[in-house]
Amino acid sequence: KTLIINFNTKTKKWDAEVKNEQSWEKDFSDLESTFIPAKEILSNSFNLISANEKSNVEFDDTYIDIIHSAKVDISAGRDALSKKPQLNRLEKIIEGKVYFDNKKDKFYMKYGSSKVEFNLVAEGIRKIALLWQLMKNGTLEKGSVLFWDEPEANINPLHIPLIVDMLLELQQGGVQIFISTHDYILSKYFDIKTSEKGMVEFHSLYKTDNG
């Protein structure tokens, strides 16, 4: 199915010209998709959803959606055997696990018996912790789609190879992944790993005389 959208810098919100929208929605309405913004948001999630619903603040829906996805309750669940090695590798980097306090409406990093508020943790660690959370709670399962804007932003370059491995393993497990990046190193790691762990397509977007 092809979805055609025409817009420019003067197009107002929701006023873009769209073709084949109805058939697109019909075919993909049941598809589970997740968008991870370049800016980490869980550290600022306290009462954000309720405030947004009451129009006290205005946030892009993608931020609200990722908070909803991260809040999925996993307390009663157990790690699937296939996920365990991946989760363990991520836990070694973040040195703990993600914990959501439903009563306080806050995310924490849990280190053994102690916990630290999410906003006190380095942003790069928080981004990796979010990936751990989405894998743990079943958001990223076979048949789902992940969109991630600049996954390398604020992450220690030493951890980039592991992030690439994680994403390629998710792809092998049936998760379709779209990444936007300006980082050559991240792209090169995908290029190197592609022959080993799956197929990756690269698309370069650039300006022309026509826009």
Where are these regions (language model features)?
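Phosphate-coordinating catalytic segments in nucleotide- and nucleic-acid-processing enzymes
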Residues: K1-G143, G211
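Switch/communication elements of ASCE P-loop NTPase nucleotide-binding domains
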Residues: Y108-G211
